[in-house]
């Protein structure tokens, strides 16, 4: 009871001055009606004590309401700072504690922040016994006492819960107001036993620096949409709390975005070499860095190499290389000699007229086997059928590009060459391409096996019909033969046979 009285008095001492004024006003309001009642002088003192006890109950209820209206952040700051009167730990243990009535720990949030539950001592008869158990526990920093319901039995057992709220050198526990619970925060002073324990177990207190991994170097070819660098493979013995990316070398106009923690998305890359540095920071503030390079080449064949396997879906350069057909006529020279863009400079979209230059007398460089024999034969057949007296045929490279661009069913109509063209080591010829189908289907050749299957089915059905007709005619012929009337010669033969 003495301790409860001390706590009540301490809580009343902590009330602001305005609360004292409100208390006086409330006492005055309660005292005036009693004076107006004109009690006799010989009124028993028991009635006065009853009125005073009622006033005290009202004040206590008013104090609790004011305490419940306090912000939760103020309560947490007071508990973390060890607010309230400091008292020495009862029993063994050093340090002091501060009490906060009607406060309970938010277990789930505190454990998620790094706190840990130690134990729940049994057979606790008072809050001092719970605080003493926390003081005797080296890692205990908060003790939560669950008070019994009123009226409490004489030997009621209290609930006692011990927590370690210290993580990464600070208090991480969170609290909330709740009647029926009291929390006690311990503040320990370093003693010789703690220092000896720390020296005896240096491995537990050691925090190694993090290991930064920015990933492997990247090589890209223009045009490109960008790349994503991933540094989430960085490791630490505790945890990594921050990732920082920095551009050390390269065009500063590159667009750098962080879609997720530890990653970096790059866009608007230009030709050249970029160097990026990843710096990671762990929970102890230790840092580690690693570099990664991003090399952006001019084009897919800017290194001088050529595609080794060429097909009708590729554009054949004048020097013998081949590139993807979609890279031609895109405004960027992909061929080493730039013939992919020279081929399309005189391309008229309204007349579809292309001016080609015949190959030079020098033999082109061979880089790989060609798979476009079918495309060449189709172009040659169409040229022979439509222009028997046309000028000299195009080179193999030009014919392949024509076949890839305009399709195997295109017709080539010769046009008279320009008289102003020069004939020095080369001949210029003009052709107008008129595709039978729409322009969208010129990139893929017509399948040759598509007409074989319908033809085979037609022949099979025709043969079956002919067989059925032949069988039908044979049956009709046999029926007609059986139903033929007897001739005169046959009747005479039968009659003579009867008399013989």
UniProtKB/Swiss-Prot annotation:
Regions that span the bilayer: 451-473
Region Disordered: start-end pairs: 358-445
Keyword Signal recorded: yes
GO molecular function list: phosphoprotein binding
Domain MANSC: 99-184
Extracellular side: 38-450
Cytoplasmic compartment spans: 474-500
Mode of membrane association: Single-pass type I membrane protein
CDD domains from the UniProt entry: LDLa (cd00112), PKD (cd00146)
Cellular location(s): Membrane
Annotated LDL-receptor class A domain residues: 309-345
Positions where Phosphoserine occurs in the chain: 491
Intrachain disulfide bonds: 310-322, 317-335, 329-344
Keywords in alphabetical order: Disulfide bond, Glycoprotein, Membrane, Phosphoprotein, Receptor, Signal, Transmembrane, Transmembrane helix
UniProt signal peptide: 1-37
Domain PKD: 210-305
This protein's name: Low-density lipoprotein receptor-related protein 11
UniProt organism field: Homo sapiens (Human)
Organism taxonomic ancestry: Eukaryota, Metazoa, Chordata, Craniata, Vertebrata
Gene: LRP11
């Amino acid at each position: 009871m003495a301790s409860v009285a001390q706590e009540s008095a301490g809580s009343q001492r902590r009330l602001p001055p305005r609360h004292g004024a409100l208390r006086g006003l409330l006492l005055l309001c309660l005292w005036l009606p009693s004076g107006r009642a004109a009690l006799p002088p010989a009124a028993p003192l028991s009635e006065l004590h009853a009125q005073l006890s009622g006033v005290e109950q009202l004040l206590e209820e008013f104090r609790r309401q004011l305490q419940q209206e306090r912000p939760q952040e103020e309560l947490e700051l007071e508990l973390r700072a060890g607010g309230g009167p400091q008292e020495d730990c009862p029993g063994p243990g050093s340090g002091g504690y501060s009490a906060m009535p009607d406060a309970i720990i938010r277990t789930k949030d505190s454990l998620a922040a790094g706190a840990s539950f130690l134990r729940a001592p049994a057979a606790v008869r008072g809050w001092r016994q719970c605080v003493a158990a926390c003081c005797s526990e080296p890692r205990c920093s908060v003790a939560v006492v669950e008070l019994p319901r009123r009226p409490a039995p004489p030997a009621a057992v209290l609930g006692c819960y011990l927590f370690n709220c210290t993580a990464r050198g600070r208090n991480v526990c969170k609290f909330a107001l709740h009647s029926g619970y009291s929390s006690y925060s311990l503040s320990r002073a370093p003693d010789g036993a703690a220092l000896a324990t720390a020296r005896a177990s240096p491995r537990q207190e050691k925090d190694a620096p993090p290991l930064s991994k920015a990933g492997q170097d990247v090589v890209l070819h223009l045009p490109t949409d960008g790349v994503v660098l991933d540094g989430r493979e960085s490791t630490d013995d505790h945890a990594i709390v921050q990732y920082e990316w920095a551009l050390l070398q390269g065009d500063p106009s590159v667009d750098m975005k962080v879609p997720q923690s530890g990653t970096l998305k790059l866009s608007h890359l230009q030709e050249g070499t970029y160097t990026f540095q990843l710096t990671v920071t762990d929970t102890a503030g230790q840092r580690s860095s690693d570099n990664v390079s991003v090399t952006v080449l001019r084009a897919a064949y800017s290194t001088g190499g050529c595609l080794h396997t060429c097909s009708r879906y590729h554009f054949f350069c004048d020097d013998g290389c081949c590139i993807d057909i979609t890279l031609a006529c895109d405004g960027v020279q992909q061929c080493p000699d730039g013939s992919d863009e020279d081929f399309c400079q005189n391309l008229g979209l309204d007349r579809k007229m292309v001016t080609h230059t015949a190959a030079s007398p020098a033999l082109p460089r061979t880089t790989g086997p060609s798979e476009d024999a079918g495309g060449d034969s189709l172009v040659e057949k169409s040229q022979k059928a439509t222009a028997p007296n046309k000028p000299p045929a195009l080179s193999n490279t030009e014919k392949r590009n024509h076949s890839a661009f305009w399709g195997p069913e295109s017709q080539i109509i010769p046009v008279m060459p320009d008289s102003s063209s020069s004939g020095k080591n080369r001949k210029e010829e003009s052709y107008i391409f008129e595709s039978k189908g729409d322009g969208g289907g010129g990139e893929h050749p017509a399948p040759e096996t598509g007409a074989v299957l319908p033809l085979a089915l037609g022949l099979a059905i025709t043969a079956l019909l002919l067989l059925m007709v032949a069988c039908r005619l044979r049956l009709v012929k046999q029926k007609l033969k059986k139903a033929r009337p007897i001739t005169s010669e046959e009747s005479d033969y039968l009659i003579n046979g009867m008399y013989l």
